[in-house]
């Protein structure tokens, strides 16, 4: 039994020993697992660069750097957005405009070439430099808010003179006419060999050209074709217009004085001519006995015409045959236009009496002097389908020289202030069925012309007179709804005498700071102005072609005065480039005035040589 007990005890001891080793084994396994996990965690942390407490200090810096990277990325994206906006909102429309204009010009050019081939001329159509595409015949300044007179002309700029001048002391160049289309410009003037009052014989200079930009960015007018019509015909009072076939011109042919013409019983001969792109000139006499059967005298308006709806429109004026249908239709009709804030003090009945008499001045034998507009179909045949429009005198004043203009989609008739009303007039013109309808005019109170008493620049009451001078305004500033706000022009700033030419921008009441041609005693006469834009630089320029007194070579010299239109609220007067301060070493101040009659020739010669030597 003791043996059995011992055997049981031994087995118990062995079982306890086994349990002990199992526990040790399990503990060892657990410890090794924990150690393995710790080592694995450490290795994993090391491999993933996990942050330690000391690393947390750099978190704000890291966040700041991340913020900078994000901001930089967003900035880059904004740059991309800005570039996209510029491309979509600015560059693409301009590119489309240029493309449209280029296609239009290409089609027009092709049409000209086809016409040229049909006429065996072999000559293509000229086109302005691309810098001017979209900048000719457009509303150049659209501004609802700014004061019109905050725009003003710069000093006169030097550019290529495209107008021939007299070459003798007795020569005379007068009556400039200018018109510019989207493709080319046309210019003409009269050339008289012996003084400016000769009515028996003269030449007519006619030129066709384009606008160019020099390598330095300067504007210049490049004459491509020109002709001097020196024949037995005495063309006078010519108006020119740029058309798709070249330069169309309307002239009267006269051999007598204006007063004698008004006293005659038959209309004045008229001719429709054209200088083609090939440099050839052709013309055709109009059937004035039918077209002007109610007229005793008829003349083009001197100012440029305009190409509208496949027809060329010219201003016309002259004398009506007494008691003819056209004269009877105007009987008793009149209009009175009033000065701004300067009412005529005469009794209303007397004003009406004088207004009616103003259409029949004594100078022309009491004939009714009438305004009119002549339109002619533009085709290879000259003088085709002429139609004469005679507007009612309930709208127009006494007939006078004028100009037909197109700016944007608007058409205007300028009428010279030959009657009592001094401020410049622009009648809105509506074209339909080959005829024109005029409406009450825009008036520009500060844009006056000199005149004889009682129709001087300050006149405010109706009177009968034939006076004034041709100084047309060019529509420059518009409202967004296309209503005209302001014009540019060169006026003669004197009450009675043709003196003191100045350029300015005008609203209905006042004018901007001015740019003088020279001194206030400078003699001048006709001026005609045209504005355009260099689209590439967005700069607006205006050209005033002016007759300036020139005592050395002829009585007048026709000068193309070029200005840039600027904008600010500066002083009221600017001098021409002749008087502007230039770089040190240049001495422009000795040439005073531009066209001077030097009294001391020796001293003048010395100063002139010094002046020439001072230029770099």
Curated annotation (Swiss-Prot):
Region (Involved in neuraminidase activity): 234-239
Intrachain S-S bonds: 172-196, 186-247, 238-251, 344-461, 455-465, 531-542
GO CC annotation terms, alphabetical: host cell plasma membrane; membrane; viral envelope; virion membrane
GO biological process, one term: virion attachment to host cell
Catalyzed reactions: Hydrolysis of alpha-(2->3)-, alpha-(2->6)-, alpha-(2->8)- glycosidic linkages of terminal sialic acid residues in oligosaccharides, glycoproteins, glycolipids, colominic acid and synthetic substrates
Membrane topology, from the record: Single-pass type II membrane protein
Keywords assigned by UniProt, alphabetized: Disulfide bond, Glycoprotein, Hemagglutinin, Host cell membrane, Host membrane, Host-virus interaction, Hydrolase, Membrane, Signal-anchor, Transmembrane, Transmembrane helix, Viral attachment to host cell, Viral envelope protein, Virion, Virus entry into host cell
Intravirion membrane side: 1-26
Keyword Transmembrane helix: yes
Subcellular location field: Virion membrane; Host cell membrane
Domain of life where this protein originates: Viruses
Transmembrane residue ranges: 27-47
Important for interaction with fusion/F protein: annotated segments: 124-152
Pfam families recorded: HN (PF00423)
GO molecular function: exo-alpha-sialidase activity; host cell surface receptor binding
Topological domains, Virion surface: 48-616
Carbohydrate attachment residues: 119, 341, 433, 481, 538, 600
Domain characteristics, as noted in the entry: The C-terminus (head domain) is involved in binding the cellular receptor.
Assembly notes: Homotetramer; composed of disulfide-linked homodimers. Interacts with F protein trimer. Interacts with host CG-1B; this interaction inhibits viral adsorption and replication rather than internalization.
Function comment: Mediates the viral entry into the host cell together with fusion/F protein. Attaches the virus to sialic acid-containing cell receptors and thereby initiates infection. Binding of HN protein to the receptor induces a conformational change that allows the F protein to trigger virion/cell membranes fusion. Neuraminidase activity ensures the efficient spread of the virus by dissociating the mature virions from the neuraminic acid containing glycoproteins.
Family classification: Belongs to the paramyxoviruses hemagglutinin-neuraminidase family.
Record's protein name: Hemagglutinin-neuraminidase
UniProt organism field: Newcastle disease virus (strain Queensland/66)
Gene of this entry: HN
